[in-house]
Amino acid sequence: MKVAKASLLTILAHSVSARFLAEDEINRVQLYPAGSEPEKYLIELAPGDTRWVTEEEKWELRRNGNRFFDITDHKDLGATRLRTKTKSVFPEKCSLQDKVKPLLKDLDKSEIQKNLEKFTSFHTRYYKSDYGRQSSEWLLAKIDSIIKDAGADKNVYAQPFPHTWQQSSIIVTIPGKSNSTVIIGAHQDSINLWLPSILAAPGADDDGSGSMTILEAFRTLLKSKDIVSGKADNTIEFHWYSAEEGGLLGSQAIFSSYEKEGRDIKAMLQQDMTGFVQRTLDAGQPESVGVITDFVDPGLTGFIKKVIVEYCKVPYVETKCGYACSDHASASKAGYPSAFVIESAFEYSDNHIHSVDDTIKYLSFDHMLEHAKMTLGLVYELGFTDFTALEKKGESVSEEL
């Protein structure tokens, strides 16, 4: 898509939060340098539905509500595990209330707010920008400080997962008694879909809210001595993905690596947008969390519903978001059980995203706290699940919901 200089000026003029651009700087904004052809990317909009597009065409598709994988570098994701994939098995009910409920009391919405205020202070967290690199470096340093403050730095560790672009993904590992792994994820990047490299993208809800929600769940989880000392049956990981907005690029890279390494991933939950409830309330509906039911593992999703009922003050609603709608899709494509919980029914989700207006003022930290409760409850319950015994027992709750 080519943008005339006049159109570019109009976009910038209406973007009140954009940084100041002088006339000569606007003249230097070129979508394609003279004499060069735009780079093309292979995207997948549905299983088997692929096409080559330019980066500008990617953003145009996103502005029109289309989601996709950018499979340029990961055409074979899932090919290995497709031959070995087994049916997932999850507990019939929650069983660790005596351990989880005391931890829930330590969740602190003021911590979520404080961290989100900092996270949204970066001009953008666009994955190809220096701001995106800086925000990722801040997040990694924050995670390291949480680990150190908890006295967990002998066993728990955080590492960047570098990419070919500026912003690294982040992986935190809490070793357990086995290498079987439970993953909690969110994406750390933000985007302004008009001019990603220039315009502000605070990304408070998308996905600053999810990133800081799981950060608070992680901080609170480290208060468990059993978790920190490695007594959980399974290893636990927290992921903050880069480049979700570009076509699930960061999560594809990670799960492609895990697939090649033969990693045993028992469950992956994505938290993408956890703070917006106003459209739900305006529609006369009760506050709730949205449990995605399409392109997810039904057994894991069924257990998450039980976790919400057990540990949250708000109910859940079933909703759908389509193909490749967040990073859980990368885990699923790699052959791992994945699920996604969003802030509301999808039709009532935040309509300020991907713009300068995705700011904290629209968000509910009480609602984020409910997502944190669900996250903490799930990761603790599954962290201490003996999946080997469960599979031998033949206790399957993976039937169609």
From Swiss-Prot:
It is an enzyme of class 3 (hydrolase). Belongs to the peptidase M28 family. M28E subfamily. The keyword Magnesium does not apply. Extracellular aminopeptidase that allows assimilation of proteinaceous substrates. Residues 1-18 form the signal peptide. This is Leucine aminopeptidase 1. Its main location: secreted. GO terms for cellular component: extracellular region. One of its GO terms (molecular function) is metalloexopeptidase activity. Zn(2+) 1 binds at H187, D206, D272. It is found in: Secreted. The gene is LAP1. Its EC number is 3.4.11.-. InterPro entries: M28_fam, Peptidase_M28. Keywords: Aminopeptidase, Disulfide bond, Glycoprotein, Hydrolase, Metal-binding, Protease, Secreted, Signal, Zinc, Zymogen. Zn(2+) 2 binds at D206, E245, H354. One of its GO terms (biological process) is proteolysis. Its cofactor is Zn(2+). Residues 19-87 form a propeptide. Disulfide bonds join C321-C325. Glycans are attached at N179. Binds 2 Zn(2+) ions per subunit. Monomer.
